[in-house]
Amino acid sequence: MIVKSLSLLALAAATVEGCVRERDVGSVDILSVLSKRGHGHPHLPHLSKYESMLINSFDNTTVDSWAYYYTHGIHIAGTNQSMAQWTADKWTEFGIPSSLVSYDVYLNYPVSHSLSLTHPDGTTWEASLVEDVLKEDDTTSYPDRIPTFHGYSASGEATAEYVYVGRGQKVDFERLIQLGVDLKGKIAIARYGGPFRGLKVKNAQDQGMIGCIIFTDPADDGNVTVANGLKAYPNGPARNPSAVQRGSVQFLSMFPGDPTTPGYPSRPDSPRKDKSPVVPKIPSIPISQLDAQPILAALDGHGTPGKEVNRTRWVGALNATYATGPAPGAKLSMSNVMRDTYTPIWNSIGIINGTEQDEVVIIGNHRDAWIIGGAGDPNSGSSIMVELAKAFGKLQKAGWKPKRTIVMCSWDAEEYGLVGSTEWVEEYLPWLKASAVAYLNIDVAVSGPVPDLSATPELHKLALESMKKVIWPYKGRQDTTMYDVWNTASGGEVGVLGSGSDYTAFVHNGIASLDTGAGGDGNTDPVYHYHSNYDSYHWMATYGDPGFHTHVAMGQFLGLLGYHLATDDIIPFDVTNYGVQMTKYLDVLKKYIAASKFPDLDVSKIESAICSFNVSANAVAKLQKKAEHNVHDQQLRKHLNTIYRDFGRGFVSQGGLPDREFYRHMLYAPGLDTGYAPTTFPGVTESLDAGNRTRAVEYIERASNAIYVAAGILSSCHDCNQFVAQE
């Protein structure tokens, strides 16, 4: 999830890395803009009794205590059933009956690894591959702390000359080939950022390379660097130079979940398929900027200098020219030993029964982390989920009964490839298709002060209205709303969902979804140590969110969303916004086509389908107004809720996208060469990228048909046209 709030015009260039967005709002001085608007308490909409009770139920002291618990015990996927049970027990204690749902999945764990550089003169240098122990940060010294490694990486050894491949995108490799760089049989060294890390490894593998090293570059830290005079963590907000980003290298753009059970749940007796199409065959190792420095410097003067490569973000901020190499006689030797296993994982599932059994709202966060801590990813969200359970419990004691059933989920094994949530969706898909109204996801709830939002279009209006009800503690201010800060930082644009967190399986089964969190501005806020030992309770309490006040505000926002989706008589969807957003997606597609090999490609079928959708959506909006005024017409309200629940299923096409049938939504999907960042009308754009006109025409047809199906569901309300005529 990377570009802060995704500009539609930048979709093709957008890139994503991990569960957090790659932000760049440094050109916007948020605090200055807010200050110019004046002080004083913001005008808040009237809050209902239950809204006020919900908001007032969140307490920073108890959130702090939940965060401390989650960040002081190992909880890499499949290793801590007691933490899953503790979560279920806490939810139950607060009035939400909860239990564990387990799956037996393929995972792998690190045994040993090494990396060394041999110079042409025969001298050698050994990489540390270890993050420094900090006396100020207790969990960095735990004896069972997790080594630096890549989940789903291949075991293997490799010794060879090496090539710097930039961010490891396909276009980076294409540029290297243009420059005459021999890649086959070499080891790749790539910097983080851009495509999902697994695709960096895949792209190297596809070029015949035999290993891949991925490092973190300080150029991605904006102005918050030691070079700019700031101190490194723990003494200041800059990145600790020994920090290493762990993470999965599954080929996420192909499909998420257990690589051995695509399309069906992983039970002990489930048949297993070959995992090789979606996991690497070559070894990979993540390293720190400290370890990367001598490796890059050894390439200076060999191959093409970085500035002459002419690729975006090729040159970083380390003391090297970022030359391509290879350097004759300079070789890397790498060893990576992993233990493959099938192991149980545990989802904690809690249920608040509603009065309408065929309408369900799901709220989820993953619990597993690559490190002991995980204070931001994911346990800022986990602590909020416990506090949300407490808040919902208080509402129930006060007499609240939701109209729709609420299912709360604490997922396991998200980090390996959205495994826990995907297996659960695959098991319960018939029920979800028949009942699910929406899925709300919170992953990295807090890693900084700037709120962020991505959602399917029907949820935009509810989200923005809810933001205006939450006081946002931006850098100590108490006179501004969440909406004010978000709107200033994002320009008012809600992001498009691609992949990278647990909403993925819901989106691609046509279920309305939303993902939210808060992070740094990418330029001036303290650097977030993503997937590092330094994503710790100490970092969060000192730099990320001292006092845990942003946690509280984010929990209030999530609570309001869940409350209204579960309680409002009419599901609070804005279906007309789907037409607005599809028109924007189409404008992007037209520009993409104009720059392609087939500029004459006709998209009039999509235009006609969107027009048909708009007619149906506008008719339903009129019906909603009628139902709101006629509170006694429960039949009409039920019809409206049914079509609101179901219309999104229409955008899902059987067979999915070319060569990746898991991704079935015809309007958006993770980019084939990004892994996380979204592409709109993906079947068409991928066909254009492949130079396949016939297939592009096919996916124009399939996309337009999907839009017509969704429009038809909106029009399926009994005598809808008659209702509109009576208006």
Curated annotation (Swiss-Prot):
Question: Where do the segments described as Disordered lie?
Answer: 255-279
Report the record's Gene Ontology biological process terms.
Answer: proteolysis
Any one GO CC term of the record: extracellular region
**UniProt-annotated binding residues for Zn(2+) 1:** H366, D443
Signal sequence region: 1-18
Q: Where in the cell is it found?
A: Secreted
Q: What is its main location?
A: secreted
Give the protein name, as stated in the record. Probable glutamate carboxypeptidase ARB_02390
Task: Name the species this protein comes from.
Answer: Arthroderma benhamiae (strain ATCC MYA-4681 / CBS 112371) (Trichophyton mentagrophytes)
Phylogenetic lineage: Eukaryota, Fungi, Dikarya, Ascomycota, Pezizomycotina
